[in-house]
Regions:
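Binuclear metal-dependent phosphoesterase catalytic core
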Residues: 10-19, 25-36, 46-108
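Short beta-strand scaffold positions
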Residues: 42-44
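Metal-dependent phosphoester/phosphodiester hydrolase catalytic core
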Residues: 1-12
């Protein structure tokens, strides 16, 4: 998805390799088959925060939320710390908004 950002409406940053599992479990195929999965968001890769749409399912990251783990290096080390916010309208749950907020936005 990252290598074809323009085709998948990717926004955000990729600062480290994707840490996917060692085998294909079929989870993504099962989500597609269900037809009602809107997105899957993870946070394991601490310095990635991008999101894009892949065959109708949003796949995305929330960057590192804590301060006791690795981040970017040097003066940038805490720049990506924060959390992903989701806004879901209960009257239209098929559509949502998501964005990152940074600890630095709150003086942390």
């Amino acid at each position: 998805m990252w290598d074809n950002k323009e085709n998948h409406d990717v926004v955000g940053e990729k600062n480290e390799c994707v840490c996917s599992g060692p085998f294909n479990s079929g989870l993504y195929a099962a989500m597609l088959q269900r037809g009602d999965v809107k997105g899957v968001f993870v946070g394991h890769d601490h310095i990635n925060d991008y999101v894009g749409k892949y065959f109708g399912v949003y796949l995305g990251y929330s960057a590192n939320t804590g301060f006791g783990t690795y981040g970017l290096s040097g003066a940038e080390k805490d720049r990506m710390r924060g959390a992903r916010v989701f806004i879901i309208d209960q009257d239209d749950p098929d559509h949502f908004e998501t964005y990152m907020v940074r600890a630095s936005d709150y003086g942390i």
